[in-house]
Amino acid sequence: MESYDAIVIGGGPAGAASALSLLTHHNKRVLLLERGDFSQARIGEQVSHSIFDFLAYLDLPVSEFGESCFSPNYGKTSLWGSSIESHHLSMFATQGATYQLDRAAFDETLLMAFVERGGTVIPRCKQMKIEQSDSVWQVQFVHPEQGEQTVCCDYLVDASGRQSKLSAMLGVEPVMDDQLVGVGAFIRNPDNAFEQHQRIESCEYGWWYMAGLSSELAVVTCFTDMDIMREMRLNKASVWNQYLAETSAIADCVKGSETTHPKLWVKQAHSQYCTSELPDRFIAVGDAALSFDPVSSMGIGFAMTSACHSTRALVSDSKDAVLQYQQDMARIYQEYHVTKTRIYQREKRWPNQLFWQRRHAFSALQHAS
């Protein structure tokens, strides 16, 4: 049985950064396991200048990511709470410069740096089973070519994302605040270049988001609740396009564009947190620890933050350090939730629509408590 100091489950930014931190700063022999094959489309998002501090901590020069990985973001235009456009850097008032992230380039660079420094990555790991015996973790999985494998380690990191299947196996259940999903697509327009700009527009059933990823490519996503999506059939391309055409500002920006794939993606976008006590020598990072509404633009930034801080707590073998990490996560989520609530409270035009009733009712409940 192959043995490692630490195993990280999940190959996104949180997992790759955790693996890099364990290897670079704690001299651990690290294995990273990923369920997928890294071919799925990864949606870019806005990041603040602080991401470069975490890259410096991981000893990763910005030059290694390529010229197009961090594109300057020239602001955000919103139609939120009013039919009049407003222009600002971020609805969450991010300080300093912001950038549009090329997720494919970013994720690949993190993983390549991990491998080049001696880390091991195994993709396409299915049917995972986890157990702990005498403070040693055993991870079983099935690989399509190598068959059934068993590996063991001292430390286990859950970076498996919002679904946090690994944590669920261990009885660490997240608490979901809502059922938000994103239904979207990449789009191209051969006759018109996209601006490096973000647009957000609220509507009766949720809100729309658009960002120019390059002059040739943009992303458009509709955010609503799962049951509303099903009732409106927003996951059907023809219906999605119909409602997109009914938006105000975004419809004009995408006129003449075509989706790059006939099928839309549907991705979970709900807010969630974890209150369970963690098993010994185990920690959750990124979306597996806390998940944020995309309106916050906190996903990647938090992935890097939690990765760097969690690994220090994990390898300290101190329950107090892990407890402090969990308390820090609770504080971050509480602060995020207050700000997210304020954002949704700004939109008062559709008080009788289910999506907004839920946000305003939850806000009232929070104030009452």
From Swiss-Prot:
Alphabetized UniProt keyword annotations: Cytoplasm, FAD, Flavoprotein, Oxidoreductase
Induction data: Forms part of an operon with lodA.
Principal subcellular localization: cytoplasm
Compartmental location: Cytoplasm
MF terms in GO: FAD binding; oxidoreductase activity
Effect of a null allele: Cells lacking this gene do not show any lysine-epsilon oxidase activity.
Alphabetical list of Pfam families matching this protein: FAD_binding_3
Top-rank taxon, per record: Bacteria
EC number(s) reported in the record: 1.-.-.-
Coiled coil: none
Cofactor(s) listed in the protein's UniProt record: FAD
Cofactor note text: Binds 1 FAD per subunit.
Extra facts: The intracellular stability of LodB is dependent on the presence of LodA protein.
Described purpose of this protein according to its UniProt entry: Is required for lysine-epsilon oxidase (LOD) activity in M.mediterranea. May be involved in the generation of the quinonic cofactor of LodA, leading to the active form of LodA containing a tyrosine-derived quinone cofactor.
Name of protein: Putative FAD-dependent oxidoreductase LodB
Gene assigned in the entry: lodB
